[in-house]
UniProtKB/Swiss-Prot annotation:
InterPro entries linked to this entry: NusB-like_sf, NusB_fam, NusB_RsmB_TIM44
Similarity comment text for this entry: Belongs to the NusB family.
Key words, A-Z: RNA-binding, Transcription, Transcription antitermination, Transcription regulation
UniProt organism field: Streptococcus pyogenes serotype M2 (strain MGAS10270)
A Gene Ontology biological process term: transcription antitermination
Name under which the protein is recorded: Transcription antitermination protein NusB
Keyword Metal-binding: no
Cystine pairings recorded for this chain: none
Domain of life of the source: Bacteria
GO cellular component: cytosol
Entry function: Involved in transcription antitermination. Required for transcription of ribosomal RNA (rRNA) genes. Binds specifically to the boxA antiterminator sequence of the ribosomal RNA (rrn) operons.
Annotated GO MF terms: RNA binding
Amino acid sequence: MTNSFQNSRRDLRERAFQALFNIEMGAELLAASQFAYGYDKVTREDAQVLELPIFLLSLVTGVNNHKEELDNLISTHLKKGWSLERLTLTDKTLLRLGLFEIKYFDETPDRVALNEIIEVAKKYSDETSAKFINGLLSQYVSEAPSANKS
């Protein structure tokens, strides 16, 4: 991985997904974020705590702090017969992350946030899940475009 990719917003979204997934498995927020950001950057001889990018911390902290609200939004956009509990942890985490950025990051256009989370979904899930995530987030964006930013 090049340094420019490691510090790109796409890479930081991917690392936020990894941290959030680890938090769901019981990890502490800061430790999960530090590991997700630094696991491939630090060698044993050069072990040091890396300064976490604000964008990464904002995503992880924001999703974690708004999880109940995000889960309610996801639930309201699920088709009849589906529940949040039926979704895989990967899909739930990706949906939370995508919804959070769409809803709370004014500097990121909704379509950019949507496309970026779909790219992460393609890497960590299958094509069916990526299409499902795309459909749910697209529905959210199209239903209330002016009300999505809080």
